[in-house]
Structure formats: structure tokens, C-alpha cells
UniProtKB/Swiss-Prot annotation:
Signal peptide, first to last residue: 1-22
Lineage: Eukaryota, Metazoa, Spiralia, Lophotrochozoa, Mollusca
Propeptide positions: 23-47, 74-78
Protein name: Conotoxin Cl14.9
UniProt keyword list: Amidation, Disulfide bond, Neurotoxin, Secreted, Signal, Toxin
Domain notes: The cysteine framework is XIV (C-C-C-C).
PTM text: Contains 2 disulfide bonds.
MF GO annotations: toxin activity
Organism (species): Californiconus californicus (California cone)
Origin: domain of life: Eukaryota
GO CC annotations on file: extracellular region
Modified sites of kind Isoleucine amide: I70
Length: 78
């Protein structure tokens, strides 16, 4: 992966995780269970995240709420 592509992916991940605490961005996406459980309990489950990824085609919901691999793969393919 070129440096430009790496920066683009990092920028997308930062944008996708902007609603999450800044500490989680440095170490990768981390679930803030308090926020997620109040907004949408289904997103706490892997099945819910996969369904959101498939529905949105971007995987941003997966990264923001669960940080699972399918979301990262979808973003790098854009």
C-alpha cells in the first residue's frame, strides 16, 4: 500500500470514529458500550454489525460501533 493510500484509509477511519473518544482512535476502534447500548443495542453484536455493513456498503457503522474486520476491509476497497 502506498503512503497516499495509507493516509486516505487513516483519514477515513478517523472520520468514521469521530463520535468515539479520542483515546480509542489512537489504538484503533474501541466500543464505547454505554453510548452504543443507549443508541442501538443490536450494533453490539457481531451479527448486527455485519448486517449494518452489508446494508450501508461502507462499513463505517461497523468501525464506529464495533471495530470488526469487515468494516476495515470495506473502507480500504473504496
Amino acid at each position: 500500500m502506498t503512503a497516499k493510500a495509507t493516509l486516505l484509509v487513516l483519514a477515513l477511519v478517523v472520520m468514521a470514529t469521530s463520535g468515539v473518544s479520542s483515546a480509542s482512535v489512537a489504538g484503533g476502534p474501541v466500543v464505547n458500550s454505554d453510548t452504543v447500548s443507549r443508541s442501538d443495542p443490536e450494533r453490539l453484536s457481531t451479527r448486527g454489525c455485519v448486517a449494518n455493513c452489508q446494508a450501508n456498503q461502507t462499513g463505517i457503522d461497523c468501525i464506529k460501533y464495533c471495530g470488526i474486520g469487515i468494516g476495515r476491509r470495506d473502507i480500504t476497497q473504496q
